[in-house]
Amino acid sequence: RFKKIRRLGALPGLTSKRPRSGNDLKNQLRSVKRSQYRIRLEEKQKLRFHYGLTERQLLKYVHIAGKVKGSTGQVLLQLLEMRLDNILFRLGMASTIPGARQLVNHRHILVNGRIVDIPSYRCKPQDIITTKDKQRSKALIQNYIASSTQPQEELPNHLTIDAFQYKGLVNQIIDSKWIGLKIN
């Protein structure tokens, strides 16, 4: 994980740790001109590692985004941001996207009153995301919310959360300015 962060820069969905400054790293002493291929590859890898996707999943999302009207890049980021695991991360119910994937896989999360155990589930506007009524599920989410470093003001405007009921609501499709990943 840390090798990926050192290579590609800060990936907030992968871990909360930040890479060291460029002066400390030996491999950045040489300034080599970066080719167009390398730039595109690094940006693709940022997407893959940040959202926890396989190559095949990313290609499928690119194909879907290409069919929709509008900028393919913006539509791709909207598709990735509307995944259930990413929404849990944005709501502060999990500290990282892999942590959110684990919550979903272990069946702690309900969407509109139904258990969803697929992290790539595409959320729609007006979806209500809650935890199971079991004490263990509520305790897990409570720990994440209590230890969250993200203040309530930084919650994207397409999401609302009720921390006391462990409930989140998707208001609308995400606006491009709220996407936390810097992509060229």
Curated annotation (Swiss-Prot):
Q: Name one GO biological process term.
A: ribosomal small subunit biogenesis
Record key words, sorted: Chloroplast, Plastid, Ribonucleoprotein, Ribosomal protein, RNA-binding, rRNA-binding
- GO molecular function ontology, one term from the record: structural constituent of ribosome
Q: Where are the transmembrane segments?
A: none
Q: What is its main location?
A: plastid
Quote the function comment for this protein.
One of the primary rRNA binding proteins, it binds directly to 16S rRNA where it nucleates assembly of the body of the 30S subunit. With S5 and S12 plays an important role in translational accuracy.
Listed NCBIfam families:
PRK05327.1 (NF003717), rpsD_bact (TIGR01017)
**What is the designated name of this protein?**
Small ribosomal subunit protein uS4c
